[in-house]
C-alpha cells in the first residue's frame, strides 16, 4: 500500500499538478512544457492501469492509496488528459464514484467550485492574474 501511496505522492500528484498549472494557470502558454507533463501523466496512467488489471482497487482492497490517487485521476480532464485507452482506470473511477464515502466527499463545497473560479484563484496564487 505504501508503494502505491508514494506512487501518487511522487508521481501522479506532482506531474498532473504541473500539467494543471501550465495548462490553466500559468500566464504564458508553453506547449512543450504542457506536453512534457501530459506525457508523463500518460506514462503514469499506463502503470496504474496495469496495476488495476486484476483488482477492484489499487492494492486489491480499498486503501489510502485509492483515497490519495482518486482526487487527481478523477480530475484528469483538468490536466488535458483522456482515459479512453485506460479501461481499468475508467472502471476503478466508476467504482470509487459509486462508494458512499466518496460520494459524500465529493459533496464537499470545495469540489463544487466553478472551474473558472478555480482558474482565477490559481492564476492569482502564481502571480498570473
Task: List the predicted regions and their residue ranges.
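Acidic/histidine-enriched, glycine/proline-rich intrinsically disordered or flexible terminal extensions
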Residues: 109-129
Amino acid at each position: 500500500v505504501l508503494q502505491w501511496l508514494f506512487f501518487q505522492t511522487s508521481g501522479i500528484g506532482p506531474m498532473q499538478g504541473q500539467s494543471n498549472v501550465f495548462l490553466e494557470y500559468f500566464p504564458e502558454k508553453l506547449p512543450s512544457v504542457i506536453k512534457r507533463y501530459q506525457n508523463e501523466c500518460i506514462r503514469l496512467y499506463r502503470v496504474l492501469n496495469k496495476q488495476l488489471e486484476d483488482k477492484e482497487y489499487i492494492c486489491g482492497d480499498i486503501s489510502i492509496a485509492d483515497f490519495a490517487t482518486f482526487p487527481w485521476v478523477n480530475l484528469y480532464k483538468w490536466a488535458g488528459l483522456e482515459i479512453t485507452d485506460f479501461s481499468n482506470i475508467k472502471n476503478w473511477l466508476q467504482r470509487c464514484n459509486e462508494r458512499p464515502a466518496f460520494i459524500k466527499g465529493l459533496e464537499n463545497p470545495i469540489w463544487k467550485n466553478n472551474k473558472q473560479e478555480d482558474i482565477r484563484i490559481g492564476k492569482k496564487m502564481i502571480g498570473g492574474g
